[in-house]
UniProtKB/Swiss-Prot annotation:
Organism whose genome encodes this protein: Escherichia coli O9:H4 (strain HS)
PANTHER family, A to Z: 4-AMINO-4-DEOXY-L-ARABINOSE-PHOSPHOUNDECAPRENOL FLIPPASE SUBUNIT ARNF-RELATED (PTHR30561:SF9), SMR FAMILY PROTON-DEPENDENT DRUG EFFLUX TRANSPORTER SUGE (PTHR30561)
Domain of life: Bacteria
InterPro entries on file: Flippase_ArnF, Small_drug/metabolite_transptr
Record lineage: Bacteria, Pseudomonadati, Pseudomonadota, Gammaproteobacteria, Enterobacterales
GO cellular component terms, semicolon-separated: plasma membrane
Function: Translocates 4-amino-4-deoxy-L-arabinose-phosphoundecaprenol (alpha-L-Ara4N-phosphoundecaprenol) from the cytoplasmic to the periplasmic side of the inner membrane.
Periplasmic compartment segments: 24-35, 98-100
Name of the protein in its database record: Probable 4-amino-4-deoxy-L-arabinose-phosphoundecaprenol flippase subunit ArnF
Lipid bilayer topology: Multi-pass membrane protein
Length: 128
């Protein structure tokens, strides 16, 4: 069950990251504090997506807490790397994100996935 909670945490955190990225690219920069506050108070789509991203992170932390009750930290922590993979893929697939494909990034994703497989695949006992 810990693995399920961990996957929920990763998926929710990835969606939250995409939401925050969208909001950050559409809201005024925080260096223009009054414009930023005015945009938040107007509670338009950008501000609502920012709020959803922040709430998503909060929900992700709850799922992560549940994960750590059921799964060893050494395994649970490795799951977090899947968020990088999900956000990378989503940025290329979703319209408007302009994520770029590169062989270097693909190699990095392959390394992450290989590492996860090494950590999570069951160990087999060898007979001598």
């Amino acid at each position: 069950m810990g693995l399920i909670w961990g996957l929920f945490s990763v998926i929710i955190a990835s969606v939250a990251q995409l939401s925050l990225g969208f909001a950050a690219s559409h809201l005024p920069p925080m260096t223009h504090l009054w414009d930023f506050i005015a945009a938040l108070l107007a509670f338009g789509l950008d501000a609502r997506i920012l709020l959803l991203g922040l709430l998503g992170y909060l929900l992700s932390v709850f799922c992560w807490y549940k994960t750590l009750h059921k799964l060893a930290l050494s395994k649970a922590y490795a799951l977090l790397s899947m968020s990088y993979v999900l956000v990378w893929i989503a940025s290329m697939v979703l319209p408007g994100w302009e994520g770029t494909f590169s062989l270097k990034a693909l190699l990095g994703v392959a390394c992450i996935m290989s590492g996860l497989m090494l950590i999570f695949l069951p160990m087999t006992k060898q007979r001598y």
